[in-house]
Regions:
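Bacterial N-terminal signal peptides
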Residues: 11-21
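Flexible loop/hinge segments at secondary-structure junctions
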Residues: 24-352
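Glycine-centered signal
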Residues: 3, 22-24
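Bacterial N-terminal signal peptides that target proteins for export
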Residues: 1-12
Length: 352
């Protein structure tokens, strides 16, 4: 396997927070919060940082290194918060050694993107065909099964070059969770997680790395968060959902996926929205979370962090749709409010 390595985006999120309950001098002193993790929400987190910096006052240094790296740094307590599109496992939570909270930020769609001359957005993918492409069983662009779903497409007699993530990735977790639901062979042979043993393909680091490989290499096919495909002007496919409809990944179809699973979201918010019910639901979607400890070691940093998360899950939601992330449903925001009020430092709640 040839792996293209792309330097992780490191973004200094200049965010200023007015921290209540501390002295005026302390409130004016800069508070620095360090975080690391998912590339999936980077476009939105970047936007949030610009807007929030104009309103308030603490610097947040966020390393966009992938969900796997973010979880590792969070467990090691080398950052103030982690960020992931794949939930931590029970084993990882035990390793963290504290009360771990997954705070949903938004939901997003994982899309199938490709580079075939003359083939634009709208190529249809049935679940079994998509799984078999990543298993290496559907290896040609003009495979009869792919042609059957796309009778009008001019698909060449060329090898399909699969592109996947080379780093630990929540985007991979969402995608492989979906493949495990629709393909028994994938579930038993490969499985799901932030990292898996890929049967075939090239690797790219981060969503931006996969997008770069696909954009530069003819006959490739990979998976990225929707915003990365749009930003790079890359075509993406429609995926057949459980209702039998080929559905485009849009803000509306992603929201439909979330709505379909809203009643079953567990107390800890660890859930995927893959292969959901609903005629208009896009079948490959999930939350992106910020990971925090329920008991903060530093009252000032802890207050700054939960204040920002309150803003992000309220005022910050209005910036999500323009980047094609699905805002959190209001009923879910009400639950998150209750979760944030449980965050403490030195035994005292950090929010009213």
């Amino acid at each position: 396997m040839h792996v293209m390595r792309v330097k992780p985006m490191v973004v200094a999120l200049a965010i200023m927070l007015l921290v209540g309950g501390i002295s005026t001098v302390r409130a004016q002193s800069p508070v620095i919060l360090n975080g690391a993790g998912a590339t999936f929400p980077y476009p939105l987190y970047s936007k949030w940082s610009q807007v929030y910096a104009a309103e308030t006052g603490v610097q947040i240094n966020y390393q966009s290194i992938g969900s796997g790296g973010g979880i590792r740094q969070f467990i090691a307590k080398t950052v103030d918060f982690g960020a992931s599109d794949g939930p931590m496992t029970d084993e990882q939570i035990a390793q963290a050694g504290g009360r771990v909270l997954h705070i949903p930020m938004v939901a997003g769609a994982v899309v199938v993107t490709y580079n075939v001359s003359g083939v634009t957005t709208g190529l249809n993918f049935s679940p079994d065909v998509l799984a078999d492409i990543f298993l290496g069983k559907v290896a040609k662009w003009n495979d009869p099964r792919l042609m059957q779903d796309n009778p009008k497409a001019a698909l060449p007699a060329a090898d399909i070059i699969v592109v996947h993530r080379s780093d630990g990735s929540g985007t991979t977790n969402i995608f492989t969770n979906y493949l495990s639901k629709v393909s028994p062979q994938w579930k038993t042979q490969v499985g799901e997680g932030t990292s898996v043993n890929w049967p075939t393909g090239l690797g790219g680091k981060g969503n931006e790395g996969v997008a770069g490989v696909v954009k530069q290499t003819p006959y490739t096919l990979g998976y990225v968060e929707l915003a990365y495909a749009l930003t790079n002007k890359m075509p993406f496919g429609y995926v057949r959902n459980k209702a039998g409809q080929f559905v485009p990944p849009t803000l509306s179809s992603t929201s439909r996926a979330v709505d379909g699973g809203l009643a079953t979201i567990p107390q800890d918010y660890r859930v995927f929205f893959t292969n959901p019910d609903g005629k208009d639901a896009y079948p490959i979607a999930g939350f992106t979370w910020i990971l925090i400890y329920g008991e903060q070691s530093d009252p000032v940093k802890g207050k700054a962090l939960v204040t920002f998360l309150w803003w992000a899950t309220h005022d910050g939601q209005k910036y999500a749709p323009t980047l094609l992330y699905a805002p959190l449903p209001k009923s879910l925001v009400a639950r998150i409010e209750q979760t944030l009020t449980t965050v403490t430092a030195q035994g005292a709640a950090l929010l009213p």
